[in-house]
């Protein structure tokens, strides 16, 4: 029997997660199998710890989860082993950096990150993994949108060049507003509201991978660097995840209605995305 595929799961958490995300995240993880520990059930362990040493419970539980907590799940013909890392409430790029370090340290095959303000389908991992196999992607994200008007998709095409004054490369990101729908869309970068990525890129790139003084988001910057070592970046627009706003969850349906009712000229301002040929999902 072949070795399980090892996946590290992390939730970059700034400490202000809306409660709407809690139940959704629980359902996401329940799809990945039954929680297992080496000696006793986690629930029993937590109860005993809170009873005997409440002042130390949180720190000990965090260490216990990181060392022993894992899910094992068979998807199709492949066996997956899921590990959860508790990073804590820190700056999101720093949280991604720590997750990547753990993925490299423990020889994970994939890193799977879900931001703490996203509402996702229960079977999102299965969908992204299947799409990754179909497309040959090294980084794949579901369709998502910014939380504020005009609610842009976090899908980007880049223009690269050489800065003769500073003697350095530069790149400019352009949002792909009219993206191909129900396709696997190859792109230059995508937002990491949720992302599944292979870990070989961390070995090829020099750390820090996400922390930077650049004036662009850490997710876009990582995609730019990863493509330089041969990675392919895709967005799966066959489904979308909700971005928790106030008070609205920003989904594709909400954005389409916003364009029709408020931003009626948006289709005239943005061209169709043609830089890469989008892949049709099998079965279409």
PLM regions: where:
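Hydrophobic pocket-lining residues that define ligand/cofactor binding sites across diverse proteins
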Residues: 103, 132, 226
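Short, high-confidence coil segments that cap the C-terminus of an alpha-helix
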Residues: 108, 136-137, 231
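Short beta-strand-to-loop acidic/aromatic patch adjacent to the donor-nucleotide binding site
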Residues: 108-119
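C-terminal catalytic/acceptor-binding lobe
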Residues: 199, 204-284
